[in-house]
């Protein structure tokens, strides 16, 4: 835990939407009188018909969650149509291509017209309200158009990250019963071209239910087009009208399905609905990022993940924001790319993942200092806890000690940000997600099921629902209940552990399955990893537990070294001693393996399941590795594995 406290600068207290006193007042109302609070905040969007009741939800029994009952609205209308009168000529999306120099600025009116055209295309393909549409596109404007078009006509989009394998795509098409697939000839990722149509063809062969495949001509690569099934996006849209009336949707009608990894390795299709989701993403985007008219906002996530859904498209566009879509990667053509984009587009708000921060930190300060970044006033992180060392580098080097950092905790299932600083209200502690957002009631539960009061550590749960909470797992409500509502009855079980300090701040300690029990002592992997990364020789670390005859479990650490350091037995001993001194003897790694890389998904998350299997020598059952960014990393880990199981 970091002892540093960064107080809110006076200018932020004055300019922000929310200072500490207002946060306390709004938060208290949101939990003590949620009907009044959410009834007021729901007016930030336009309703075709008003809702009759704010909420009717229960975490017990069959688990039934409903918000803004009987209200009628359309998400695409709220992201586009209602802005046309005042913002029609304002930029909605800045597209920054993979190659420097490739860019496009799309106004709200242009985006509206493109969405209407493609809505009509979908209708001409027989898509109706409630139908599922699979989208397998790179980070190009057509991805935003496709998802908004689905929302406009009441279809349910299922976006599959464009780095996923044909098998992963086929599984998601089959599970959601999609008869329409939208893809591109190729995607671009740094110097590589990714054959999306090729992968889509293989997936369609496996899934066997896709009737129409709409293909964006992105790179111009020569790809096979199956007569009667495959259709070119540009040819279809050219024929259609720029007007398409929005479908009136019930507040609880589905908006999208997004697949997330399950503990069993089987993906879960998390279902989000319409009214509560758009109210909550709009509210969180405004307050967490302190978004004001005219700000240039950039979330670096891929829309294939929930962060991209909520904080590249839906939240920002509902607020009439300028949002950036970036096709490329942080290190192409060099490690200054992110900061060059910040300068080029005068970005004010920058939101990225801790794994990106650590990767850029590994390259030193020069790629950052080669740019000015004077426009940037707020930084954010999302996806996993950020270790204090990376937080401090981000604050000192990228933000030049003038930019607050909003370290946000939330999940695919929560729909929007849950625990977070508000930049004008919250003193910051590096590594802490700090305090709950409006309407969020976190609690800590011990292993006996008792709710902890005051400072403590336990399972992180939520005591009541919020508007953006997922409603079910598509086609499997029993799995929804068993995953999130059985472990601690009457609460939403996040699957994460957390610590609450004496100031009421929350520190996410990692997934529950990332807790190691060494000789009866429960240790969060995040704490040990942060300790290792605090050593100058360590660029990145991942820690897992493995069976031990005496201790029950012992610690196996995988360490990636910073440039200028070489693996050695001396360094291995030094790092083990470093952790021992920092946390205590109980946290000393039993095994420490040096590695050039860690196994990560294409969204940058470490696949700890793989690391546990390697540590325990369970090499014949590694499970699904289709989401790995670089499968060769696993081979290297196995080759250099240190015999650990006792």
From Swiss-Prot:
Its cofactor is Mg(2+). GO terms for cellular component: cytosol. It catalyses: acetate + ATP + CoA = acetyl-CoA + AMP + diphosphate. Mg(2+) binds at residues 533, 535, 538. GO terms for biological process: acetyl-CoA biosynthetic process from acetate. GO terms for molecular function: acetate-CoA ligase activity; AMP binding; ATP binding; metal ion binding. The modification N6-acetyllysine is found at residue 605. Disulfide bonds: none annotated. It holds the Pfam family AMP-binding_C. Belongs to the ATP-dependent AMP-binding enzyme family. Catalyzes the conversion of acetate into acetyl-CoA (AcCoA), an essential intermediate at the junction of anabolic and catabolic pathways. AcsA undergoes a two-step reaction. In the first half reaction, AcsA combines acetate with ATP to form acetyl-adenylate (AcAMP) intermediate. In the second half reaction, it can then transfer the acetyl group from AcAMP to the sulfhydryl group of CoA, forming the product AcCoA. NCBIfam families: Ac_CoA_lig_AcsA (TIGR02188), PRK00174.1 (NF001208). This is Acetyl-coenzyme A synthetase.
């Amino acid at each position: 835990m970091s002892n540093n406290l960064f107080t809110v600068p006076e200018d932020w207290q004055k300019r922000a939407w929310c200072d500490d006193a207002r946060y306390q007042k709004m938060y208290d109302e949101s939990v003590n009188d949620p009907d009044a609070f959410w009834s007021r905040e729901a007016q930030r969007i336009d309703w075709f018909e008003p809702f009759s009741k704010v909420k009717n939800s229960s975490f017990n029994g069959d688990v039934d969650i409903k918000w803004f009952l009987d209200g009628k609205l359309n998400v695409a209308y709220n992201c586009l149509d209602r802005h046309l009168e005042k913002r029609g000529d304002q930029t909605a999306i800045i597209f920054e291509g993979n190659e420097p120099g490739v860019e496009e600025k799309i106004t709200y009116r242009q985006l509206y017209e493109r969405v209407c055209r493609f809505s009509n295309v979908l209708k001409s393909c027989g898509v109706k309200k409630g139908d599922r549409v699979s989208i397998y596109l790179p980070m190009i404007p057509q991805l935003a158009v496709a998802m908004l078009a689905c929302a406009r006509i009441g279809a349910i989009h299922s976006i599959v990250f464009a780095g996923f394998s044909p098998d992963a795509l086929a599984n998601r098409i089959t599970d959601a019963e999609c008869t329409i697939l939208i893809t591109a000839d190729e995607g671009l990722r740094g110097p590589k071209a990714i054959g999306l149509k090729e992968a889509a063809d293989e997936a369609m062969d496996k899934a066997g239910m896709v009737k129409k495949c709409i293909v964006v001509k992105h790179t111009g690569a020569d790809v096979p087009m199956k007569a009667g099934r495959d259709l070119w996006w540009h040819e279809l849209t050219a024929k259609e009208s720029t007007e398409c009336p929005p479908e009136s949707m019930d507040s609880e009608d589905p908006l999208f399905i997004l697949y997330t990894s399950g503990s069993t390795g089987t993906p879960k299709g998390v279902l989000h609905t319409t009214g509560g989701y758009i109210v909550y993403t709009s509210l969180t985007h405004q307050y967490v990022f302190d978004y004001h008219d005219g700000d240039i906002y950039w979330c670096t996530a891929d829309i294939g993940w929930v962060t991209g859904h909520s904080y590249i498209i839906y939240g920002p566009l509902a607020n009439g924001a300028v949002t950036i879509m970036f096709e490329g990667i942080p290190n192409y053509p060099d490690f200054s790319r992110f900061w060059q984009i910040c300068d080029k587009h005068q970005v004010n708000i920058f939101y990225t993942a801790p794994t990106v921060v650590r990767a850029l930190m590994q390259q030193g300060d020069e790629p950052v200092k080669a740019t000015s970044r004077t426009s940037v006033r707020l930084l954010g992180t999302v996806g996993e806890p950020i270790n204090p060392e990376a937080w401090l580098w981000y604050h000192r080097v990228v933000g030049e000690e003038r930019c607050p950092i909003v370290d946000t905790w939330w999940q695919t299932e929560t729909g929007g940000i849950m625990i977070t600083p508000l930049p004008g209200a919250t003193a910051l502690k590096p590594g802490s997600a700090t305090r709950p957002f409006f309407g969020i009631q976190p609690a800590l539960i011990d292993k006996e099921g008792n709710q902890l009061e005051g400072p403590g550590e336990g399972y992180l749960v939520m005591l009541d629902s919020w508007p953006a909470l997922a409603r079910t797992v598509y086609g499997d409500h029993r799995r929804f209940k068993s995953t999130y509502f059985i472990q601690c009855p009457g609460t939403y079980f996040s699957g994460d552990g957390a610590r609450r300090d004496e100031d009421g701040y929350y520190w996410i300690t990692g997934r529950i399955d990332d807790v190691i029990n060494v000789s009866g002592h429960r240790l969060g992997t995040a704490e040990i990893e942060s300790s290792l990364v605090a050593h100058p020789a360590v660029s990145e670390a991942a820690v897992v537990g493995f069976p031990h005859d005496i201790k029950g479990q012992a610690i196996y650490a995988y360490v990636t070294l910073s440039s200028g350091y070489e693996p050695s037995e001396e360094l291995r001993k030094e790092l083990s001693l470093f952790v021992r001194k920092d946390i205590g003897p109980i946290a000393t790694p039993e095994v420490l393996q040096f590695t050039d890389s860690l196994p990560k998904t294409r969204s940058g998350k470490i696949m700890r399941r793989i690391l546990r299997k390697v540590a325990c020598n369970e090499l014949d059952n590694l499970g699904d590795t289709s989401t790995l960014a670089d499968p060769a990393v696993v081979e290297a880990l196995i080759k250099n594995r240190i015999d650990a199981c006792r």
